[in-house]
Structures are given as C-alpha cells and as structure tokens.
C-alpha cells in the first residue's frame, strides 16, 4: 500500500514533498526505497540511538519532534545527528494532548527554541478540530515565523481514527490551506518595499502639504498666518519643509487653496 500511495502522490502532485514518520529502525531501509524527501522523528525517539543514527546517515532533512521533551533531551538528539550527518534539522513543537486546549499551546515557547538552538521551527497542531480554534489557532502560528505547519487530515473525523481529535475532513482541510495561504500572503517580507498603487493614491489624498490660506500677491514675505497644512489632490511641499519658505518673498501671485 505504501508503494502505491507514494507512487500515486508523486504522479498526482508533482511538487509534493513526501516525509515519512519513522517509529522502528527496521523499517528505514524499506522507507528509503520509496525515495522519500525526508523523515519525521517522533519525540518518543529523541533518545533512541538506533533510529537517530540510521535516519541521520541517510543525510536527508529531518523534522525532529520535541513535544514533552527536555532541553537536554533535544540537545543530545541534535548532537547525535550532527556528529554523523549533514541533515537539515527542523524542530517540530506541539503540546502533546488530544485535543490541546488553547491555553496549553504555549506558542511563545517556539521563539525560545529558535533562539536556543538556532534551527528552523515547525508547529504540530493538536487543537480541537470540532472547534473554531482548530482552524485559527494553528494558522496564527504563522506569525511566529515557523518553517513548517503540521495539520492532520482524515477521511471522516466522526469515525474517530488515529489523532481524529485534531484532524480535519477533506473539505475542511481545503479551507484551512486557503486560510494559511492568505495569511502567508498577508505577512509579506520583512524588508522595505515599494509603495503599491493603492498606497501611492493614499499618499496623494491623505498626506498633508503646505498651502496658502488667502490670496497673496507676489512680493509678499510669507509668515505663519499665510500658510496651513492641508490635504490636497496631489502632494506638494511637505510640512517639515516649512522653514524653507517662512520669511521668503513670494515671486508670483498665489491664490488661496
């Protein structure tokens, strides 16, 4: 079945990355024969040298689950992998309760993990799929600059299969992915960018410019009583340039704005 599933997935979704969650070291050679893209290791195997070593020697990306694990356990697992491998490691954090109550998610701990280990962080969601929090809470973790968002999917949650508490039905999963993509788009990039055409238009009618408040003849020496800061259809001289015109002689007749 696994051979058929992987083959179908690759043919149907050419850009799909296939990661396999490993629980037994004896299955790794078979998994490798499927030509997968990477491995996920359960937090129960953070101290399992047989699984850690065999997966590490494949030199493929590793998603390392760290839920309900100590900092020392995580450090030891990372060191063991790095000592024998060039695998890229992503730490996958998630509260290990099914379903997870929002107050137990402890989302900010992902920042601590990222700061301490200097590695990419992913979030494993186990929130109640029968509740709105099963949608918005995992989506909210995108604001924590995670690299991977793990969400369970099931054919039918009502049948109560493995991890059904947090698993979305297919149509729900489609909606969830749409939500995630929307948030990703909204996040943008952490860099200065050119104004959009909407922002340019906003600047034109919202930003204030220096204008004259009455009809003034040329030769007049401008003072504060002659000018004001107002919105105009097009940007003129910005208010912070007022010192450039106060006390200067007007060279042309100027009508009040």
Please describe what each predicted stretch is:
Residues 1-257:
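Catalytic cores and adjacent flexible loops of soluble metabolic enzymes
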């Amino acid at each position: 079945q696994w051979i058929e599933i992987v083959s179908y997935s690759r043919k149907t979704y050419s850009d799909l990355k296939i990661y396999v969650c490993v629980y037994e070291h004896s299955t790794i050679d078979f998994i490798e024969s499927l030509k997968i893209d990477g491995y996920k290791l359960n937090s129960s195997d953070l101290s399992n040298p047989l699984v850690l070593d065999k997966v590490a020697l494949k030199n493929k990306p590793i998603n390392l689950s760290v839920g309900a694990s100590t900092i020392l356990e995580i450090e030891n697992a990372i060191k063991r992998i790095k000592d024998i491998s060039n695998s890229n490691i992503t730490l996958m954090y998630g509260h290990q309760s099914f379903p997870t109550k929002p107050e137990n998610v402890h989302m900010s701990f992902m920042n601590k993990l990222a700061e301490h280990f200097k590695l990419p962080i992913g979030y494993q969601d186990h929130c109640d799929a029968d509740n709105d929090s099963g949608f918005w809470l995992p989506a909210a973790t995108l604001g924590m600059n995670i690299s991977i968002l793990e969400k369970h999917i099931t054919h039918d949650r009502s049948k109560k299969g493995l991890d059904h508490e947090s698993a979305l039905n297919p149509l729900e999963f489609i909606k969830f992915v749409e939500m995630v993509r929307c948030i990703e788009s909204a996040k943008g990039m952490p860099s200065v960018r050119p104004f959009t055409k909407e922002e340019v238009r906003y600047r034109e009618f919202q930003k204030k410019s220096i204008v004259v408040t009455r009809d003034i003849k040329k030769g007049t020496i401008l003072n504060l009583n002659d000018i004001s800061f107002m919105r105009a259809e097009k940007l003129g001289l910005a208010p912070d340039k007022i010192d450039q015109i106060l006390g200067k002689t007007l060279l042309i007749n100027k009508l009040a704005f």
